[in-house]
Amino acid sequence: MATTSLASAFCSMKAVMLARDGRGMKPRSSDLQLRAGNAPTSLKMINGTKFSYTESLKRLPDWSMLFAVITTIFSAAEKQWTNLEWKPKPKLPQLLDDHFGLHGLVFRRTFAIRSYEVGPDRSTSILAVMNHMQEATLNHAKSVGILGDGFGTTLEMSKRDLMWVVRRTHVAVERYPTWGDTVEVECWIGASGNNGMRRDFLVRDCKTGEILTRCTSLSVLMNTRTRRLSTIPDEVRGEIGPAFIDNVAVKDDEIKKLQKLNDSTADYIQGGLTPRWNDLDVNQHVNNLKYVAWVFETVPDSIFESHHISSFTLEYRRECTRDSVLRSLTTVSGGSSEAGLVCDHLLQLEGGSEVLRARTEWRPKLTDSFRGISVIPAEPRV
């Protein structure tokens, strides 16, 4: 053991010290004797006693012996260190690693769940999951060489002032990851009719391979100058067509038709919602996830405390600009925290034009953190 070896080294050092004369000095050594002709005759006073220069040299410690003892101590410590049971740290998944599968058509990227992405129940939110998918979308386009001047625009799209806008998104969540987990996002694109592009996602637990989230979205082209929808030019189709695959993460029959709300049918209403400068992307377009945040403005906190979103459908009807003022409306079906809930949502401009319709389905959380909440409180409409 390290203790035994070090103790032996210290005993050796002690023996060296005891071998010196009674004054703690080393014995007289012939190699330190000075020639009589060269020996100085002057005497020096040390603590009131006169000593010659030759005698002073005799009183110096034997540094070679001390150095040998110190070397022995360090050698013993180093030997014991190499004998310890040392194991290399397990290799972590390569975070933020981009790679492809299915002959280069399925893009994969891993994400570590950060502390700022989890809530009071220690799980991620639907917004954090959608942020990961949005980041994978842009890196997918960049990796296959179809990323132009803007986010998600190809070179031919940039020449024609075109950009992709999301028309519909559906997310189905089986389980939310927690802080410290690592997830892998898979995404791929395919055709949707004559003028649409479909993008599908699978989010997996890197440790177990379990599918946590499935998502599909439909995008169409919009002219950045006229802000009107456009057909897909042949040149653009030639850029993105080779990356299309015929596979879906969510079937169309899983997506239910959305209901229209108005002031008389909504349970919760909030107005005065406006986009800010940091809500815009490089295309001067309000980020899609900002619409989701506005939808949640009229969802009671009690629902977030007792339920998770199990599915989420969004239909974008109109673009809002930086000067827009919006209203968020929500109606809730069901009233017990022990059963599933369904919420219908609407975002509209202050003038009444629809911006977005949405539907969220909620399932009870498995934790007991909020067991005290039994019913969803009625709140007055504003």
UniProtKB/Swiss-Prot annotation:
CDD domains named in the record: 4HBT
Quick one: effect of changing N283A? Reduces catalytic activity 33-fold
Outline the protein's biotechnological or industrial applications: Introduced by genetic manipulation and expressed in canola by Monsanto (Calgene) so as to obtain laurate-rich seeds.
* Chief subcellular location: plastid
Query: Changing F201W: reported impact?
Result: Reduces catalytic activity 7-fold
* Annotated positions for site Important for catalytic activity: D281, N283, H285, E319
- Note the subunit structure: Forms homodimers.
Q: What is this protein called?
A: Dodecanoyl-[acyl-carrier-protein] hydrolase, chloroplastic
Q: Which organism is it from?
A: Umbellularia californica (California bay laurel)
